[in-house]
Structure formats: structure tokens, C-alpha cells
Amino acid sequence: MSTDTALSAADAVFEAEQAVSRARWVVEELQETIGSALRVLDDAELDSAKVKLSERGSFYLAAAGEHLGRLRTRCNEMPELTQDLFTHLNRATQSVSDARTLLDLADTSDPVIASEVAQLKPRIAVVGEMVALAKPVAQLAAQHVETAHQASRDVTALGLLEPVSLERSIATAGKELGRADEDVRLLGNVVDHAAASARESAGIASEISDNARRRMSEQSRDPVPSASLPTPRSPGR
């Protein structure tokens, strides 16, 4: 592996680590947003139940509708988060692919390089596997979030006059948000594993980068042999 190739491989690993870290932050935001939406939904469900039990049924019906409006706001935030998540996961996938391609070009005749590559290859492979596993889980979460969002949008001003319609929308949104919550929890575990492997990979990549720069520095200090000067001729007689 030439010095330039070593540095390029290390850079690709660093980019993968950054992308996975950003994906992890987005997953945490999704967890917080879904948790907030579920709490809003609990409030809506409570007020919906009071509609039949209280003389102030119309008040609680309107209150439940307001909660669903807040739920729509929470759900409106999630598509952008899931889009950001896929952007980071796709970037991580590309960076892992680039790193593996460059590592395959390694000249393992050098024992130091061979040792570095042997350590890095399996770890960067784990990052790729975890990211590949995260994508379908993220897709499921996005689908459930969208269904919950649709359920919250289905409640119109006319629908608020019908407790049955309201309860149905709350039940649908609750079911889908519950599924999304489970998906995102699983997604969090997968991305955590990817992030841990990515950090280990970045640590090894730092060693590769440092060694490559050291070799460059040593090569630049090596004296360049000068061309032999021509032997002076004896003066002609």
C-alpha cells in the first residue's frame, strides 16, 4: 500500500466514523421525538375517554383534538429526521466501500502494513454490516411514523364531532407510533454497535495515517545521491 493509498484509506475510515456518529445523533433525536409524540397521544387518549364519562364531553373532545394537533406537529418533524438518517447511513456505506477497496490494494509484504490491515479489515467490515442492517429497520420506522402521521391528519373539524372517529384515529396513531418506537430502539442498538466498531476502526486508521506520514517525512529527509562528476581530463601535451 503506497503512502497515498494509506492516507486515502484512513480518510475513508474517518468519513465512515463521522457518518455513523451523525446517524447515531439522528436516532437519538428520533427517539426523543417519538417519546414526546407518545406522551401527547396519552393525553389525547385520556381526554377522549372522558368524553363519555363527563358532562363536559364537548370540552374534552376539543381538548383531545388539540392534543392530536400537537401530535401532527411532532410527526411533521420526523420525515426530515429519517431523511437525514438515510443520508448519513448512505454516506457511511460509501465510505466503508471506499476504505475496503483501498485496503485490498495494500502491499502486505511489509509486516507493519500487513498487521495494520489485518486489524482494520474485520472492524470496518463490521461497520458495513451494521449499517446495512440499520437501513431496513430505519425504513420500517419511517413507514410506521408516516402511518401515525396520516392518522393524526385524518381528524378533521367534522371528525371531532364523532368520538368514535376520534378514538379510532388515536388507536391507529398509538399502534403505529408504538411500532416506530420499537423499531427506533432496535435501530439505536444497531447503530451503537456500528459506532463502536467505527471508533475502533478510526483508532487503527489514525495509526496507519501517522505511520504513512512518518514514512513520507523520512523519505523527504533521505539525501538524494548526486550525479558523478566527470573526471577531469589531463591537459593535452
Predicted regions, residues:
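Long, low-complexity or tandemly repetitive, helically biased scaffold regions used
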Residues: 2-226
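Long, low-complexity, intrinsically disordered segments
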Residues: 221-237
